[in-house]
Amino acid sequence: EYGKTEMWYVVDCEPGASLYFGVNRALTKEEFKKRIEDNTLTDVLYKADVKKGDVFFIQSGTIHAIGAGILICEIQQNSNTTYRVYDYGRRGADGKLRELHIDKAIDVSKLTPSDTSDKQGKPEEIPGGTKCALASCPYFTTEKYVVDGEVEIDVTGDSFASLVVTEGSGKVVGSENEVEFKPTDSLFVPAGSGKIKI
């Protein structure tokens, strides 16, 4: 397997927080492996300082790590694949160090710099608020809605919708029920639900 494509939305962070994604220059597989072995890999990773509202699109095969003091909302391709090359000495439920997957990671990792530009669109005015495209790929599409009143979304039969609340409270009203929400709530809306109001 070749990993999974992900998108990170920074919900909140402490001052000076940062994360890593991709390499800051081209590497050979040999150098990549040596840097893992001698614990100098972060020297050649792209380090990004973050602020609330930042968006990072991480293609499969891109090495990445979230630093301390960051709360993200992660949207990802449906895949259970994770290859660890470093794990901060963390232990699993059994008390043993979690498995590393260095050889597999070397085989599938993208060892050229990633596109680090911000891809999110500009907010557009819609009835009841604004909508902004954050990321779109074959596996998912993400949009950010800022609601100042009532916003209507059409959940077609093409896909379900996952609503993640980062700020504020309110309710989602569908044709058959309504659900109240608050920050950090995540709501699943089945495909074909039709028009819902937030």
Task: Name the predicted role of every residue range.
Residues 1-52, 67-169, 173-175, 179:
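Active-site region of the double-stranded beta-helix
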Residues 172, 196-198:
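Hydrophobic beta-strand residues in large extracellular and virion-surface proteins
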Residues 162-163, 186, 198:
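C-terminal functional regions that serve as terminal interaction/effector modules
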Residues 49-68, 75-77, 181-195:
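Conserved metal-binding segment of the jelly-roll/cupin
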